[in-house]
Swiss-Prot record:
Protein name (Swiss-Prot/TrEMBL): Endonuclease V
Keyword Acyltransferase attached: no
Catalytic activity: Endonucleolytic cleavage at apurinic or apyrimidinic sites to products with a 5'-phosphate
Hydrolase found in the keyword field: yes
Originating species: Bacillus subtilis (strain 168)
Gene ablation phenotype (knockout): Deletion of the ywqH-ywqI-ywqJ-ywqK-nfi operon has no visible phenotype, however it is out-competed by wild-type cells.
Gene responsible for this protein: nfi
One example GO MF annotation: magnesium ion binding
InterPro entries: Endonuclease-V
Cofactors that this protein relies on: Mg(2+)
Swiss-Prot/TrEMBL site (Interaction with target DNA) positions: Y86
One Pfam family in the UniProt entry: Endonuclease_5
């Protein structure tokens, strides 16, 4: 799959991270560029981390499924040492090198990517799902398991029914949704990544839910695969 060269990752200072985020923020597109019914393939993206000889390592897995049958079409991964330091609010800079490396291995071009992480629901609207879209050139969706509290704003818990949601509104702007994907199971936190609107993100996400998890199928599969791969690399000291 073709990946665009948007910026380098040799930055170390928070000020440099922030400048990149603000430059890209002006190019975020939350219009409906894709219709949920037109999707044939979708990908889930997740990462896992560990330490080896005092150095941080990570593995990224991308799993592509058929949107109709939910069968796995392709899976790829990348592994390596993490060179970008962790700074709160700038996690994407740490994760993107492995995401890009894995995406380049894809023979399939997914119609949409779903990330285990935030997108527009972020301090600067630049969570990993949003940031990654500039490199991937595809619509992206953020699926977070825990709530990122911004400007002290809490979310309103949705009703218990499947598909119930409440908009997450901060300073009068909708950042995302608290979404109940399974009855009586705690919600996930949905946000647009890029090149997609919130209603389409909602429809796509709900179409990928089954009884096994509150997470969309490709995200859950990617999550499981990263844990398997992390265990493998830890045991083999690769």
């Amino acid at each position: 799959m073709k990946v665009f060269d948007v910026h380098k990752f040799d930055m170390k200072k928070e000020q440099d991270f922030l400048q990149v985020q603000f430059n890209l923020k002006n190019r975020i597109n939350l219009s409906p560029t894709i219709h949920p019914d037109s999707i044939n393939t979708c990908a889930g993206v997740d990462l896992a981390y560990w330490e080896q000889d005092g150095e941080p390592y990570g593995v990224c897995c991308i799993i592509v499924i058929d949107a109709d049958t939910k069968e796995v079409i392709e899976k790829v991964h990348s592994m390596g040492r993490i060179s970008v330091p962790y700074v709160s609010g700038f996690l994407a800079f740490r994760e993107l090198p492995l995401i890009i490396e894995a995406a380049k291995k894809l023979e399939t071009e997914p119609d949409v990517f779903l990330f285990d992480g935030n997108g527009y629901l972020h301090y600067n609207h630049m969570g990993v799902a949003t940031h990654a879209a500039f490199f991937l050139g595809k619509p992206t969706i953020g699926i977070a398991k825990t709530y990122l509290k911004i400007k002290g704003c809490d979310f309103v818990t949705p009703e218990i029914e499947v598909g119930a949601y409440t908009d997450i509104i901060i300073d009068g702007e909708v950042y995302g949704r608290a979404l109940r994907t399974r009855r009586d199971v705690k919600p996930i936190f949905l946000s647009c990544g890029n090149y997609i609107d919130l209603d389409s993100s909602y429809q796509i996400t709900m179409s990928l839910i089954n009884q096994e998890s509150r997470l969309p199928i490709p995200v859950r599969l990617a999550d499981l695969e990263t844990h398997v791969l992390r265990t493998f690399y830890q045991k083999n000291h690769v």
